Regions:
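Active-site C-terminal subdomain of aminotransferase-like
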Residues: 267-369, 373-376
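Compact, charge-rich alpha-helical regulatory domains located at protein termini
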Residues: 1-38
Length: 448
């Protein structure tokens, strides 16, 4: 077998003959012997295509994904059912391989998808303008920080510790780039953002306040008072939202939130080891020209026919770099298409029914586990509990083919014994009861 499939021995012989070289050694004659490797590389022997396929399959078989076990892990990425309709459309060649629709006259299908996606996100969030997607949730949060900096030029960003840790880290990274700093606000004893601490942190130097609904622990926040406290000095209020909870929760726009962002993986995109997915971004109309990415718009041509165009293109490849608000490329458009198809498949009633189903199963699971809740208040799809023997629970559950949830101690030292448990429509009551049996073996008496 040839070492490289792209150049066989006869190929190399022909190339050497063409340049008048007798051997490969002749090509390296100018390189001193004392710096040349005089042995074969320490690499395994080459494989045929079939051998490579079999080897990779054996490696992949060692993984235990959501299809090989019952998973209650969430923490921002969730095991939702992806209907066949979604991938039957996203895998069509017309959508699978396009680039930015620079020529709208031949890209009407792709542009209409962007427009319909923006419309759906605006309706979900209760905000009038949306872009055509960003990379994922955390960078969408961070991009909102940049918008706030463009808007008021203040130097401080205030973030609740209820915001996803990855989002807070990404926000801090972006903030260093545009000369801001991030100040974090703690959670109260019930796992919600501490309103008094938030009010104390917001001052005349605050550019924006970042919240999450539901927050990372699954707590449904009281957005009204939090948004009011955030905006009392003229700061922007940014809220990261879980789109599939908006069938049962009020949209952030109704609370006076300026920018709503979020992770789109739950909308028709598989877990896929954490990506790719897409981020969404909606805002009040006054921020339209400072929003990141592309915005598709509806228009009419010279003959009065309905058409679609890229109305705003504020990425650095389209305008002067110093005027750009983002470097987003076309990479997430296919994932956003999946999100649009999924929302159309659900419909207005479907998203309500799904939210209600998740809420019922979440409350049933919290009661069935019987463990001390970290956040005893309202929850929709996720809740946090303290586990007396967390290692024991995880070990026993994993041996039974159950992933019991996400260890909170990774991100919250104060919850070293905490477990974050997520529910979707794929988790049945039988699955919950199976986890509850493991919880019963480690359960301590919970105070009344």
């Amino acid at each position: 077998m040839s070492r490289y499939t792209s150049a066989t021995d006869p190929d190399r012989r022909a190339m050497l003959d063409a340049i008048g070289a007798g051997s490969l050694e002749d090509l390296f004659a100018d390189i001193p012997e004392d710096v040349r490797l005089d042995r074969e590389l320490d690499l395994p022997a080459g494989m045929s295509e079939q051998e490579v396929t079999d080897h990779l399959a054996s490696l992949a078989a060692r993984n235990r994904g959501a299809d090989q076990e019952v998973t209650f892990a969430g923490a921002g990425m969730y095991d939702h059912y992806v209907p066949a309709l979604v991938e039957s459309i996203t895998q069509r060649s017309e959508f699978l391989t396009p680039y930015t629709p620079y020529q709208p006259e031949i890209s009407q299908g792709g542009l209409q998808v962007m427009f319909e996606f923006q419309t759906a996100i605006s309706e979900l969030t209760g905000l009038p303008v949306s872009n055509a997607s960003l990379y994922e949730g955390p960078s969408s949060v961070a991009s909102a920080g940049y918008l706030a900096n463009l808007e008021n030029g203040r130097g401080k960003l205030v973030a609740s510790r209820g915001v996803h840790p990855h989002s807070r880290e990404t926000l801090a990274t972006y903030a260093r780039g545009f000369g801001s700093r991030v100040e974090e606000v703690p959670l109260d004893d019930d796992g919600a953002t501490d309103l008094e601490a938030l009010a104390a942190a917001v001052d005349d130097e605050t550019s924006a306040v970042f919240l999450q609904q539901p927050n990372f622990l699954g707590t449904v926040e009281e957005l009204g008072p939090l948004a009011e406290a955030a905006k009392r000095t003229g700061a922007l209020c940014v809220c990261a939202v879980d789109p599939l909870t908006l069938g049962v929760l009020r949209p952030p726009g109704e609370y006076g939130v300026d920018v709503a962002v979020g992770e789109g993986q739950t909308l028709g995109n598989r877990l896929d080891f954490g990506g790719p997915s897409f981020g969404f971004y909606a805002a009040a109309e006054r921020y339209l020209r400072k929003m990141p990415g592309r915005i598709a718009g509806e228009t009419v041509d010279v003959d009065g026919r309905r058409g679609f165009v890229l109305t705003l293109q504020t990425r650095e490849q389209h305008i002067r770099r110093e005027k750009a608000t983002h470097n987003i490329c076309t990479s997430q458009a296919l994932n956003a298409l999946g999100g649009m198809v999924y929302l159309a498949w659900l419909g207005r009633r479907g998203i309500v029914e799904l939210g209600e189903l998740m809420a019922r199963r979440t409350h049933y699971a919290r009661a069935a586990l019987g463990l001390e809740p970290i956040n005893p208040g309202p929850v929709v799809r996720e809740f946090a509990v303290r586990v007396p023997d967390l290692d024991g629970l995880v070990e026993a559950a994993r041996a039974d083919g159950v992933n019991p949830g996400y260890r909170l101690g990774r991100d919250y030292p104060e919850y070293a014994d905490g477990l974050l448990v997520a529910l979707t429509e794929r988790r049945t009551r039988a699955d919950i009861d199976r986890l509850a049996r493991h919880a019963a073996t480690v359960r301590a008496e919970v105070p009344a």
